[in-house]
């Protein structure tokens, strides 16, 4: 494998101002085959110049540019001669910093779909696109006067300056979010910026990522040993195969059966990763240990912290039996980082790979997937030669069924979720919907209700079905499963799973809900 020089790849950087959508921008750019990464808005112009990017994108964010403490930038960035695209807050920041621009609080705030009218279809950003377009707005402020040298290129009923452009300087602003799928021509607009404005080359691929990560892992680890916690999910499995490819037997994997796994999962992990790929796996039966720690705990954040901490404790116990372990590998993804919050984004919920680590953790962390989205992880798995059925398994959180049993966890509740989830997966696959639906699972909300079975009255649990369509997990719509399929699933669950007399279907999108219930 040849060493990979990052300077050979054209790059567009995204400066982070705190939008929950900001990492989607990097994802969209990468889809074009152009390398992109999300970086701090605190970077100086000199630091950016050293990186030699083809373009810069200012992300959206929750601030008002005119407020004290609002996220700002080094104004010298505008003097670098590098194309800049400002999205939402990024556009307002551009107007606020450049002479003649003005930003004010909007009389009518916009959150959701809106219709824009393109005023200049000759402008490079809207080239070959319709005059009217559906876009996704999410703003409380707006640009009321464009800076000197700019023209208004699009407008909407509630946002007279929906887009602006200075072709001479190659500065562009969009009040709407091109990175969100609800923006009809968002990808086309970003593509125009990447290729027509920035003149970037499409020379980045997953093969390059593999080469880079293997090189980075080897440089980081040296001759030391790495410990990996296998959860049974796609992410940790891909991390295991990638690390094994990079460092071979320097990797020891610990598979903790914490009693919170899906039906038959422990056996599948040992057979596929231990057998086919030859990973050195130590299996630990810690079911009683985890359930004792979780007894009486109902708060979802506390459950996540307990599970995350206990995983580390198990690793401590097992690593004490091993020599030379210095690193702990985790399957943290981009979406985990953003949902756990950064210095610019509020925490939605702590992720088990991010917020559950104790302060006295004994290992240095390796997180080779923390710049990838879920769909990229699946692509990576297939590039590594992993079985299709393993790579395309349903996403499964590190805390396992511990966050699919709402409230206090008991063995009876876990069995209900295991059995009902298996039925759901069987029926979805039987009806050929497993590739159409991005994620599907059952939850136990902890609700009991009255029912009638046979000649008797019952007072049993309700099972919830969650099924969503998505590209990367950042936004999601509930899957419109045919009614007859839902009926079959419901009938099977009520008849085959003990202590269940009602099945409900979650029809909430993300946002406002998250995909998991806890």
UniProtKB/Swiss-Prot annotation:
Sites where the protein binds ATP: 231-237
Pfam family, one: NAD_synthase
SUPFAM superfamilies listed in its UniProt record: Adenine nucleotide alpha hydrolases-like, Class I glutamine amidotransferase-like, GMP synthetase C-terminal dimerisation domain
Domain Glutamine amidotransferase type-1: 11-203
Involved pathway(s): Purine metabolism; GMP biosynthesis; GMP from XMP (L-Gln route): step 1/1
GO CC annotation terms, alphabetical: cytosol
Annotated active site: 88 (nucleophile), 177, 179
Enzyme Commission no: 6.3.5.2
GO MF annotation terms: ATP binding; GMP synthase activity
Residues covered by the GMPS ATP-PPase domain: 204-393
Top EC class, one word: ligase
Entries under Gene3D superfamilies matching the protein: 3.30.300.10, 3.40.50.880, HUPs (3.40.50.620)
Function recorded in the entry: Catalyzes the synthesis of GMP from XMP.
NCBIfam families, per database record: guaA_Cterm, guaA_Nterm, PRK00074.1
Subunit structure: Homodimer.
Name listed for the protein in its UniProt record: GMP synthase [glutamine-hydrolyzing]
Organism of this sequence: Ligilactobacillus salivarius (strain UCC118)
């Amino acid at each position: 494998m040849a060493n990979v020089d990052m300077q050979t790849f054209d790059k567009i950087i995204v400066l982070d101002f705190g939008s929950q959508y900001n990492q989607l921008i990097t994802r969209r750019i990468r889809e074009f085959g152009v390398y992109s990464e999300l970086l701090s808005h605190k970077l100086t112009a000199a630091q950016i110049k050293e990186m030699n990017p083809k373009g810069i994108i200012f992300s959206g964010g929750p601030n008002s540019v005119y407020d004290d403490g609002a996220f700002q930038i080094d104004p010298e960035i505008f003097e670098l001669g590098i194309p800049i695209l400002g999205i939402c807050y990024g556009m307002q920041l551009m107007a606020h910093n450049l002479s003649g621009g003005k930003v004010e609080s909007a009389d009518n705030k916009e959150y959701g779909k809106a219709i824009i009218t393109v005023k200049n279809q000759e402008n490079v950003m809207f080239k070959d696109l319709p005059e009217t377009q559906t876009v996704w707005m999410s703003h409380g402020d707006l640009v009321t006067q464009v800076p000197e040298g700019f023209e208004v290129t699009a407008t909407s009923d509630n946002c007279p300056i929906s887009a602006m452009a200075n072709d001479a300087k190659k500065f562009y602003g969009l009040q709407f979010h091109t990175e969100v799928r609800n923006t009809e021509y968002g990808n086309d607009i970003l593509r125009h910026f990447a290729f027509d404005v920035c003149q970037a080359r499409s020379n980045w691929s997953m093969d390059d990522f593999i080469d880079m990560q293997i090189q980075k892992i080897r440089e980081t680890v040296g001759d030391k040993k790495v410990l990996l916690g296998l959860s049974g999910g796609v992410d940790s499995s891909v991390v295991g195969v990638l690390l094994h490819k990079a460092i071979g037997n320097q990797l020891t994997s610990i598979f903790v059966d914490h009693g919170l796994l899906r039906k038959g999962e422990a056996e599948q992990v040992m057979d596929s990763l231990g057998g086919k790929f030859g990973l050195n796996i130590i299996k630990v039966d810690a079911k009683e240990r985890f359930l004792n720690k979780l007894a009486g705990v109902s708060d979802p954040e506390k459950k996540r912290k307990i599970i995350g901490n206990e995983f580390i404790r198990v690793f401590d116990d097992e690593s004490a039996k091993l020599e030379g372990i210095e690193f702990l590998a985790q399957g943290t993804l981009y979406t985990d980082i953003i949902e756990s919050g950064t210095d610019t984004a509020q925490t939605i919920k702590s992720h088990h790979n991010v917020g559950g680590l104790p302060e006295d953790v004994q290992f240095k962390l390796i997180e080779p997937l923390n710049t990838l989205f879920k769909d990229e992880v699946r692509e990576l798995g297939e590039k590594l030669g992993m079985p299709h059925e393993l790579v395309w398994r349903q996403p499964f959180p590190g805390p396992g069924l511990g966050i699919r049993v709402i409230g206090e966890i008991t063995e009876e509740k876990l069995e209900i979720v295991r059995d009902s989830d298996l039925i759901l997966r069987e029926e979805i696959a039987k009806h050929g919907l497993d590739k159409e639906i991005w994620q599907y699972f059952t939850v136990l909300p902890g609700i009991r209700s009255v029912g009638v079975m046979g000649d008797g009255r019952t007072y049993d649990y309700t099972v919830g079905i969650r099924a969503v369509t998505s590209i990367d997990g950042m936004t999601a719509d509930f899957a419109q499963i045919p009614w007859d399929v839902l009926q079959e699933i419901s009938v099977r669950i009520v008849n085959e799973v003990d202590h269940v007399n009602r099945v409900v279907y979650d029809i909430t999108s993300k946002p406002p809900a998250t995909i998991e219930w806890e």
